[in-house]
Amino acid sequence: MFNSDNLRLDGKCAIITGAGAGIGKEIAITFATAGASVVVSDINADAANHVVDEIQQLGGQAFACRCDITSEQELSALADFAISKLGKVDILVNNAGGGGPKPFDMPMADFRRAYELNVFSFFHLSQLVAPEMEKNGGGVILTITSMAAENKNINMTSYASSKAAASHLVRNMAFDLGEKNIRVNGIAPGAILTDALKSVITPEIEQKMLQHTPIRRLGQPQDIANAALFLCSPAASWVSGQILTVSGGGVQELN
């Protein structure tokens, strides 16, 4: 029988990385509104603090923590901070990442950085919080991957392959952690109208995107936050090892 309480996160404690803006910010606010206590992590400390202020104004509990996800030391400090402030970690949302288009003849440092942002940080932070989740009977790890993981395009070698690696981590970590009652899933967003996308999209590009989108609009950060809430809630207690594409049914390309 359906129970709306299964979409609540009351009593849960969550870390959300890259939560100072865009999708991560919306996930943090949505989770807090659903009852979770959240650590808002971002490389931009001011942005993280602003999100915490918004959550507190809504009556939620949140703490800000600056973190450069390419630093193992800072990831470890983030996990320690969350445990010290929240007492436990039930949910990790690995939203921070990056990379973007790079030419094939890119320096190897650029190629490595895509993997540091999208793969190594996700895996290491998961390693850090999984034992804490196990102590408390289980938990949920969610990563924001990309439709680029399954698609092909010019100048996307480093970004797309790193996101494909992250997606495959989801599938394999679900097996590694399932016996500990830790679920692992991912979301592959389509074109989401974050401030970052709004700064580069033109009306012509948007119209081209809409031609390939059965639901004739581009996504909003709340669309991804809603999917994240489901996947991290008790309503998805038998969902693990999955990548959920949220794209209005289409494939949008920024070219």
Curated annotation (Swiss-Prot):
Homotetramer. GO terms for cellular component: cytosol; protein-containing complex. It holds the Pfam family adh_short_C2. GO terms for molecular function: chenodeoxycholate 7-alpha-dehydrogenase (NAD+) activity; cholate 7-alpha-dehydrogenase (NAD+) activity; identical protein binding; NAD binding. GO terms for biological process: bile acid catabolic process; lipid catabolic process. Changing S146 to A/H: Reduction of the catalytic efficiency by over 65%. No effect on the affinity for cholate and NAD. NAD(+) binds at I23, D42, I43, D68, I69, N95, Y159, K163, I192, L193, T194. Optimum pH is 8.5. The enzyme is stable between pH 8 and 9. InterPro entries: NAD(P)-bd_dom_sf (IPR036291), Sc_DH/Rdtase_CS (IPR020904), SDR (IPR050259), SDR_fam (IPR002347). Glycochenodeoxycholate binds at G99, S146, N151, Y159. 7alpha-hydroxysteroid dehydrogenase involved in the metabolism of bile acids. Catalyzes the NAD(+)-dependent oxidation of the 7alpha-hydroxy group of 7alpha-hydroxysteroids, such as the major human bile acids cholate and chenodeoxycholate, to the corresponding 7-oxosteroids. To a lesser extent, can also act on taurochenodeoxycholate, taurocholate and glycocholate. Can also use glycochenodeoxycholate as substrate. Is not able to use NADP(+) instead of NAD(+) as the electron acceptor. This is 7alpha-hydroxysteroid dehydrogenase. CDD domains: 7_alpha_HSDH_SDR_c (cd05365). The record marks S146 as: Transition state stabilizer. The gene is hdhA. The keyword 4Fe-4S does not apply. Belongs to the short-chain dehydrogenases/reductases (SDR) family. It catalyses: cholate + NAD(+) = 3alpha,12alpha-dihydroxy-7-oxo-5beta-cholanate + NADH + H(+); chenodeoxycholate + NAD(+) = 7-oxolithocholate + NADH + H(+); taurochenodeoxycholate + NAD(+) = 7-oxotaurolithocholate + NADH + H(+); taurocholate + NAD(+) = 7-oxo-taurodeoxycholate + NADH + H(+). Its EC number is 1.1.1.159. Disulfide bonds: none annotated. The active site is at Y159. Inhibited by N-bromosuccinimide, diethyl pyrocarbonate, and some metal ions such as Co(2+), Fe(2+) and Cu(2+).
